[in-house]
């Protein structure tokens, strides 16, 4: 079960990084927009941290999307 959780965290992190770079945002820009710490964004993007629902909601709002769209990682490859 842990490996599935780790894979999901990694995929979510990859998607967040892809969305962030597509919008030409730095980690600091995203952190400020979402009201989070820049180090937290980095840890999430590297798959080192599993973001809470509240954190995902803040990130989704910063990207002007719904949480469900943010966590849809069906097209993200590791």
Model regions and ranges:
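A short, Lys/Arg-rich alpha-helix, primarily the initiator
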Residues: 1-22
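Short alpha-helical DNA-recognition segment
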Residues: 24-43
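DNA major-groove recognition helix of helix-turn-helix
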Residues: 45, 63, 71-74
């Amino acid at each position: 079960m842990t490996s599935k959780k780790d894979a999901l965290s990694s995929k979510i992190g990859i998607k967040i990084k892809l969305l962030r770079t597509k919008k030409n945002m730095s980690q600091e820009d995203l952190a400020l927009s979402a009201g989070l710490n820049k180090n937290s964004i980095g840890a999430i993007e590297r798959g080192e941290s599993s973001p809470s629902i509240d954190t995902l909601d803040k990130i989704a709002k910063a990207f002007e999307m719904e949480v469900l769209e943010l966590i849809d990682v069906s097209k993200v490859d590791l």
